[in-house]
From Swiss-Prot:
Claim: Ribonucleoprotein is one of the keywords in the record: yes
An example Gene Ontology biological process: translation
Species annotation: Bacteroides thetaiotaomicron (strain ATCC 29148 / DSM 2079 / JCM 5827 / CCUG 10774 / NCTC 10582 / VPI-5482 / E50)
Gene3D superfamilies attached to this UniProt entry: Ribosomal protein L31
Record-given protein name: Large ribosomal subunit protein bL31B
UniProt similarity note: Belongs to the bacterial ribosomal protein bL31 family. Type B subfamily.
Subunit structure, interactors included: Part of the 50S ribosomal subunit.
Keywords: Ribonucleoprotein, Ribosomal protein
Gene: rpmE2
GO molecular function, one term: structural constituent of ribosome
């Protein structure tokens, strides 16, 4: 490998799916301030909104996943308007 080409902070990080609570360990260069104990070790923690364990494409369930409240925000702005 060439020196100075690859990131120095490539390390194991725990990713936590906030929609269902599942966690998995993977290597990443992401900068985080939170840590968590996972399988007896302490790792940096990155919270994500959706992962393969909760995404409708991978689970086969067709449900509306709206963690950011985008539908509610749209309906509050434009849902009550009627054409006259």
């Amino acid at each position: 490998m060439k020196k100075g080409l690859h990131p120095e902070s490539y390390r194991p990080v725990v990713f936590k799916d906030m929609s269902n609570g599942d966690m998995f360990l993977s290597k990443s260069t992401v900068a985080t301030k939170e840590t968590i104990e996972f399988e007896g070790e302490t790792y940096p923690l990155l919270k994500i909104e959706i992962s393969n364990t909760s995404h409708p494409f991978y689970t086969g369930k067709s449900t509306l996943v709206d963690t950011a409240g985008r539908v509610d925000k749209f309906m509050s702005r434009y849902g009550d308007r009627k054409k006259k």
